[in-house]
Every structure is written in C-alpha cells, then in structure tokens.
Amino acid sequence: MIENAQARFAASVSGLSEMQENFRPAPDRWTIAENAEHIATVNSGLLRLTFKLLKQAEADPKPPADLAVPPITMTEDGELKPGKWSAPEAVTPQGGVTVAEALAKNQSLLNDLFNLRERLAAVDLSVQTWKHPALGTLDLYQWLVLIGEHQDRHRIQIETVKSSAEFPGLHPSEE
C-alpha cells in the first residue's frame, strides 16, 4: 500500500520543468516542490515515530493482534475531505528543495521503513499510540496506513495544481 502510494506520487511529479515544480496557483497554496518537500519532511518524522513505538512494542512483546485495522482515510473516493488542513509549522515547507531531492529523500526513508517489516510483523502494534494533530490518537498500524493516505492526499493536491489554467506548459503559446 505504501509502495503504491509512493509510485503514484512519483508518477504525478515526474517530468516536470523547474517552472512547473515551482508554480504557485494562489498565494496561499503550495507549489508542487513544496508538496514534495512536505511529504519527505513528514515521512522523516513518521519514521522516527515508527522506531519509537516499535521499540516500545518490542520492550513488552505481544504477538500480533488478530484484528482489522480501523479505517483511516484522508480521502473519500479519491476526493479530498472537505476543509483545508493546515500543516504544523515543523512540517511546513521551507523551500529550496527540488522535487528530485524530495523524492530521493522520501524513497530513502521508505526503504528504511521497509527494512523494519519483519520487526513490525512480529509484535502487536495496536497498543502503542501517538496523537495526530488533526486525527486524534492513532495506533502504529494506523500511523503506517496514514503514510500512504497522506501521500495520496498531496498527490491529489498536485494534480489540482497541474490542472490549473495558468499551469506552465499547458498552452500552445508556451511551447
């Protein structure tokens, strides 16, 4: 699931010019590069959180729970949930990061996460929780699902930027 979200995200930003990566559709909207930077920054924090909660689970090991992970979604049928979500300041893009740099950082982080699979599968991750600023308390299973959901949410935002009438390269006069 995370791999699929990463592939969809990477496909949505591939082949863009620097002008397209840095196009801002409105003063209060992020560029494609800023969306990519945000994803890499958030996933860096989520990897640290995963390590922290995994260490807690391994300190008091219980076999994996036989339970369905409660649904958690930031999208409904591919549409963004209503309302604008504001990113905490710590994960707000600072700029100066290209899409390629953000994608490389994100792929490295996800590779580190994938290397934890055996350890994650060996313990019950439903006991360790952490509070999300907008979604409330989530267990580690839900946090892991959120990685892909979050990338998909920003992929949809990127597609919205690309569909803007002012997006560079869409008009024959710009070719």
Q: Model-derived features: where do they sit?
A:
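Extreme N-terminal tail/first-helix region
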Residues: 1-7
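Generic recognition of short, well-ordered alpha-helical interface segments
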Residues: 4, 41-45, 97, 101-108, ...
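Hydrophobic packing residues in well-ordered alpha-helices of helical domains and bundles
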Residues: 2, 32, 102-106, 144-147
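An N-terminal domain-cap segment
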Residues: 7-29
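Short, contiguous alpha-helical
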Residues: 24-72, 118-175
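Acidic/histidine-rich alpha-helical segments that form the ligand environment
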Residues: 69-124
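Solvent-exposed, charged/polar functional surfaces in cytosolic regulatory/catalytic domains
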Residues: 8, 12, 112, 116, ...
